Amino acid sequence: MGTRVRIKLEAITGKNTEIVALLNSGAESPEPSIVIPTEIAEELRLNELKAETAYSEEATRYVKVKLYKKAVKGTLLDNGEELTSVILDVVVVEGLIEPLLTDSAIDAFNIEIISFSKGLWRIRGESKVRESV
């Protein structure tokens, strides 16, 4: 099943959108990052910003990606309630099927995954268990 959460993205370009992102602890990043497809990057008008070229290790190969440092504020949502907010680097991957949060972003949002397969999670220190969207 996987665990997915709703995130409101507010770009430094002034554009906003809400997305559903997969929590992927196997996606490692030194800074809190969200990985998005080109279409969402275009919606946020990130192409107006200067991107760094970076390479992402994916299983048996490296993939060229665009990296926008501290380009969005991400706010974790649950049924419209704003839970936590984090400034995120944005990694844009052409052909990506669904957005994902990296390990350091999951930690920065204080998300504690209870069950990956059942899609259960909570905010660290809270007892309320939430379900994947």
Q: In which residue ranges do the predicted regions lie?
A:
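Pepsin/retropepsin-fold aspartyl endopeptidases
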Residues: 1-133
